[in-house]
Amino acid sequence: MKTRTQQIEELQKEWTQPRWEGITRPYSAEDVVKLRGSVNPECTLAQLGAAKMWRLLHGESKKGYINSLGALTGGQALQQAKAGIEAVYLSGWQVAADANLAASMYPDQSLYPANSVPAVVERINNTFRRADQIQWSAGIEPGDPRYVDYFLPIVADAEAGFGGVLNAFELMKAMIEAGAAAVHFEDQLASVKKCGHMGGKVLVPTQEAIQKLVAARLAADVTGVPTLLVARTDADAADLITSDCDPYDSEFITGERTSEGFFRTHAGIEQAISRGLAYAPYADLVWCETSTPDLELARRFAQAIHAKYPGKLLAYNCSPSFNWQKNLDDKTIASFQQQLSDMGYKFQFITLAGIHSMWFNMFDLANAYAQGEGMKHYVEKVQQPEFAAAKDGYTFVSHQQEVGTGYFDKVTTIIQGGTSSVTALTGSTEESQF
């Protein structure tokens, strides 16, 4: 076990590494170690994911940027890994709608239990672990052309932190302990938080938002994981703020007040740039939530951030809340992500891809199945396309194998001394028909 002094010296040395260039911490290594306790459990999956995410953002991604899809189940994330996606995005919106611990359906307004997103992070990582165990038990190892690196970095949504700085600190720890590689926090008032594409958004003062970023970074340091921290601002659209106490915000406050006591602000890109610049020293990536897929607005934000913080990594939400073909032509849509990457937006994601694909595909199947010729539509819409996708690496046609039946047959056989008459795949329809 390392002594307190050894931990402090090790942490001080770590903070001099290139990984932390440009990152501000308004606390000391002594402060961090003081909060750890004598035993600090390792968070292996979070460590691996954070390191992998950092490498992907610095030259190892296939396209020169990460383009991610939202997932809300372990199975969705598993299929993303098989298909070649490099990181998983886990949005609070999807968790609110269909994957929260209240077992209810909510809008994206922080109404669900705060530990719901960490629970889904854990669920996804458990699926990755099982898939890895299955291929490993089959003798498939790194270097084998059949090998899939299932442990994708998970970028998780902490919303507005579900409260104050202590809530943000505890939520960040929970995300890391569940295995998240990166976590984002936004600058809205948690008690009335909204989806970035809803109205009625209320900002907190800039310094309060910074303190939540500090809380999140401190939590990562206490756990000993180089978790990537993403700072999101909703200031492009939000025209309310809780207080006029922060001089940094004064140029945007109109003087008008609402019946709730909030102050009106001048929403827009200048307010968003102001906040992005304030957050940049405390975060690994900066994200400006926008109302439309606007390349010129994205360029203005990127240029302003990079004028003061050259090379600062940026994130962009390629949201399903945008009507893409209403805003852009097909050629621009096709080149949209590459153009963003050229501006420095190295993490791009479709927040609600998982829930839209899941709900639409089920509706499409159910509509045909209910109205038409029954099994014909299941075969045409699901089973035959699954068979056709096998050439691209899709394997869920053999659904028993996919979820681990063969793996647990091996467990049974080992326990029973090498032979068993009760293994599940032998004699199954999957064995005989697929």
From Swiss-Prot:
- GO BP terms in the entry: glyoxylate cycle; tricarboxylic acid cycle
Q: Where does substrate bind?
A: 91-93, 196-197, 232, 317-321, 351
Q: What is known to happen upon mutating residue 219 to C? A: Isocitrate lyase activity is reduced compared to the wild-type
How is its cofactor bound, per UniProt? Divalent metal cations. Can also use Mn(2+) ion.
Pfam families noted in UniProt: ICL
Name any cofactors this protein relies on. Mg(2+)
Please list which residues make up the signal peptide.
Answer: none
Any inhibitors or activators noted? Activated by phosphorylation on histidine. Competitively inhibited by 3-phosphosglycerate, oxalate, malate, chloride, phosphate and sulfate ions, and uncompetitively inhibited by succinate and phosphoenolpyruvate (PEP).
Query: Which pathway, metabolic or otherwise, does it act in?
Result: Carbohydrate metabolism; glyoxylate cycle; (S)-malate from isocitrate: step 1/2
CDD domains on file: ICL_PEPM
> How is activity affected by pH?
Optimum pH is 7.3.
The positions flagged as active site in the entry are 195 (proton acceptor)
- Asked if the record carries the keyword Cell membrane, the reply is no
Report keywords, A-Z: Glyoxylate bypass, Lyase, Magnesium, Manganese, Metal-binding, Phosphoprotein, Tricarboxylic acid cycle
- Which GO CC annotations does the UniProt entry carry? cytosol
Q: Give the enzyme's EC designation.
A: 4.1.3.1
Task: Kindly state which reaction or reactions the protein catalyses.
Answer: D-threo-isocitrate = glyoxylate + succinate
- What class does this enzyme belong to in the EC scheme? lyase
Per UniProt, where does Mg(2+) bind? Answer: 157
For molecular function, the Gene Ontology terms on record are: cation binding; isocitrate lyase activity; metal ion binding
Family as reported in the entry's similarity comment:
Belongs to the isocitrate lyase/PEP mutase superfamily. Isocitrate lyase family.
Which NCBIfam families does its entry note?
isocit_lyase, PRK15063.1
Describe the task this protein carries out: Involved in the metabolic adaptation in response to environmental changes. Catalyzes the reversible formation of succinate and glyoxylate from isocitrate, a key step of the glyoxylate cycle, which operates as an anaplerotic route for replenishing the tricarboxylic acid cycle during growth on fatty acid substrates.
Description of how the protein assembles with itself and partners: Homotetramer.
**Name of protein:** Isocitrate lyase
